[in-house]
Design a protein with these regions (language model features):
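Residues forming the flavin
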Residues: 1-197
Length: 197
């Protein structure tokens, strides 16, 4: 299977509102620390999250990032549902974020200060964020709790190099070919996104 790293802890549904991650949102553990480069592959992110306290993370962004990603405006139903569910909050400052998430305020402030400093220098010394970090020194802030969840099954019919379907013993099944998501030997450790339709 492939997991998607940023999903609702209750239903397992992908949190599209947290796509702010692609525009600079950071992922924090319960201790208030970054633990992975936020644009890593889905399997790498999922594994990293599962190694954190409670097997979840918090995705944090501010209006500086929100103006780029526009996820709150693009996904108002999610915003309302996740807020009502108690896994998302909008806060004027980091103290409010710490109160909501139960992260230690001093560590949270230290992390955000470091991220903002590295953003200003254009150099993420901790995880080498390939998209570039953003200044998060001022609110308004948004935070959502997230867990990995099953996203895609990467199993299927075995095929040979000609895309001919094979029996369990590796023999060609005459007249039967397979391609895309029905195949089970082409994905490796991560789904080939171009095959998903």
């Amino acid at each position: 299977i492939q997991t998607y790293p940023i999903c609702d802890p209750i239903s397992g549904v992908i949190e599209l509102i947290a796509d702010s991650r692609f525009d600079g949102a950071i992922m924090l553990n319960q201790e208030g620390k970054r633990f992975v480069e936020e644009l890593e592959r889905r399997d790498v992110l999922s594994e990293a999250i599962l190694k954190q306290t409670g097997n979840y993370c918090w995705v944090l962004w501010n209006d500086n990032i929100g103006k780029i990603s526009n996820t709150v405006k693009e996904h108002p139903t999610e915003y309302e549902a996740f807020t009502k569910q108690g896994i998302m909050a909008t806060c004027p400052d980091l103290k409010c974020i710490a109160d909501f998430t139960k992260m230690p305020l001093k560590q949270l402030e230290s992390t955000v200060k470091r991220v903002s400093s590295m953003a200003g220098k254009g150099n993420d010394k901790d995880f080498h964020h390939r998209g570039g970090l953003m200044d998060m020194s001022e609110g308004q802030y948004y935070v959502i709790k997230a867990v990995p969840s099953t996203h895609h099954t990467m199993g299927g019919v075995r095929i040979n190099e000609k895309a001919q379907a094979l029996t369990a013993k590796g023999q060609v099944i005459p007249g039967l070919w397979a391609a895309g998501e029905v195949t089970g030997v082409t994905h490796g450790t991560n789904r080939l996104g171009g095959n998903a339709y």
